[in-house]
Structures are given as C-alpha cells and as structure tokens.
Design a protein with these regions (language model features):
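Positively charged
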Residues: 1-165
Length: 165
C-alpha cells in the first residue's frame, strides 16, 4: 500500500497563488523531486483534478502535474511555441471548486521541461492536454483562472455554482 503524500489545497486568497514561482534547483533541491512529483500527483488525484501546480499546495516551485498516462510532472517548464489558432473551452481549477468558465487558449503548444530524473524534453501537446499544461503554466506564473477569463464569464461561472449549490 502506497503512503498518502497528498497535501491540502491553499485557499484562493493565499498570496502564493499570485507569485511568480522560483525555478526548481536540481543542484541544491529544497525537497526530493521524486517526492514532490508524488505529492503533486496524489493531491491532484485525491481532488479529482486534471492539473495541479506546486503553489496550489503552498510550495513556491515552477512545477506542476498533469493528468496523463502516466501522469506528467513538469519542472521548470517553458512554452517554446504555440499555434495561432485559439479556441474557447470551459475550464475549472482546483483553486476555485465548482466554478466553470470559458477561456480562450491556443490549441497546440510545444513545451520544454525537466522531468524528476533531471532529463530535459521538448514535446508537442494538442487538445485538452495542451490546455491543462497552459493552466499549470498560469499557476506557476501567479495567474489564476479568474485572471484568464472575462469578467462576464467569471460572473456567470460564480452564478452557476451558487445555483447548483
């Protein structure tokens, strides 16, 4: 049986969500990268999430986990290219449970990131995985779901959550 490493999510008002996170330093790590990956993955799964960034659990690192098979943990990611085509789709965030809003994002991205084993990869992602990764990037850049949608869509999402309880 695997040990539960999951953590509590920070509140939407926590200032860490507004900070540009620091690079994860593999040469002098503040915590083991494999352990951090497991913490993020377990917390994401426990909360039925699709993406979870370190600041959402109170850690100031440029790291996030994305639901995939297997789960991807991206350290110090950089989006190196995006398609010019952008579409609106509904998104949610573990930071704002129950709020669903429309967000316009590129459909295809190329991203360079480091894995927990310190290997660097550059990969292309499309569709929903691309969108989850862009959400993770926002989170480590101090940008929340509320920041990437229009005020109209935000208000509609809040109203719908209240209506649905």
């Amino acid at each position: 049986m695997e040990t539960d490493l999951s953590r509590d999510l920070v509140k939407p008002t926590d200032s860490i969500l507004r900070n540009d996170c620091e690079r994860f330093d593999f040469k002098d790590p503040q915590m083991n990268p494999d352990e951090l990956s497991h913490i993020l993955a377990q917390t994401m799964m426990k909360n039925n999430g699709l993406c979870l960034a370190a600041p959402q659990i109170g850690l100031p690192y440029r790291v996030f986990a994305v639901l995939s098979n297997p789960i991807l943990c991206m350290f110090n990611p950089i989006i190196v290219d995006t398609t010019s085509e952008e579409i609106y789709l509904e998104e949610m965030s573990l930071t704002y449970p129950g709020i669903v809003v429309k967000v316009k994002r590129p459909t295809i991205i190329r991203i360079r990131f480091t894995q927990p084993d310190e290997k660097t990869r550059t990969e292309k992602y499309i569709g929903m995985t691309s969108r989850y990764i862009q959400q993770g990037m926002d989170s480590i850049d101090g940008i929340t779901l509320k920041d990437v949608t229009t005020s109209y869509h935000w208000e509609q999402g809040v109203k719908k959550r209240k209506k649905n309880g």
